[in-house]
Amino acid sequence: MLRDMFGYDTISMIDIALYGQFSENNYNGVNCGIMDQFAIAMGKKDCAIFLDTSDLKYEYAPVKLEGARIVISCSNKKRGLGDSKYNERRSECETALAEIQKVKDIKSLGELTEEEFEAVKDAIKDPVRQKRAKHAVYENQRTVQAVAALKANDIAKFGELMNASHVSLRDDYEVTGIELDTLVEEAWNCPGVIGSRMTGAGFGGCTISLVRTDDVDNFIKKVGRSYRSEERRVGKECRSRWSPYH
């Protein structure tokens, strides 16, 4: 919009992403990173982006979903990140990082392998903060593995990593909730599902699932029906949309 409507052709797309992050941090009260803004600015057809947020170095990983589609399921649970526990999770991770830095020279939790984290985790005094940090470390390693899976066109492995990611987001980072968990758990029980997890910051919003093409229609019906059957409990109706990937 800055380029098209106001003629700011000299501004790079990465700078525009940084401006978006600045606006979220300073005007919307959300202490977010740059992932969403970077994906919007630098997205490329049929590719995922592998981004190092510490220095904004990135590479594209091919997304070849032959015989499968991406299905987005909306929980219809609205949330504002400024009013959610999003900022609290960020603060918990920052405190955990400061505790680890007393015993190990690192700049971010993402620098740690799982083994390195297990060796220093007792430096984090609070068990809740320890869980938050564990998620950050293990999720980072899952991301590295996911890129390798995409490059190898190993969609089954990618799906396994999606599932493990949701479990960690549910149990260690605790940002899912009954609506997202219901959608994901119903997806896991559907034929043809390769993987499913919440997407975004959590506390509502959507799930993303990889589903075999021939099973998409049944998936949408089954997950929607199961979610509606829980309506008295979750009070929402599911909407699903599938992508043109095949």
Model-predicted segments: where are they?
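Glycine-centered loop/turn positions within well-structured domains
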Residues: 47, 205, 240
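Positively charged, low-complexity/disordered segments
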Residues: 235-246
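Short, small-residue alpha-helix embedded
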Residues: 1-5, 204-211
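C-terminal nucleotide
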Residues: 42, 47-195, 210-233
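Fold-level recognition of mixed alpha/beta catalytic cores in primary-metabolism enzymes, strongest
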Residues: 1-72
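Conserved phosphate/anionic-ligand binding catalytic regions in large, soluble enzymes, centered on
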Residues: 32-40, 197-206
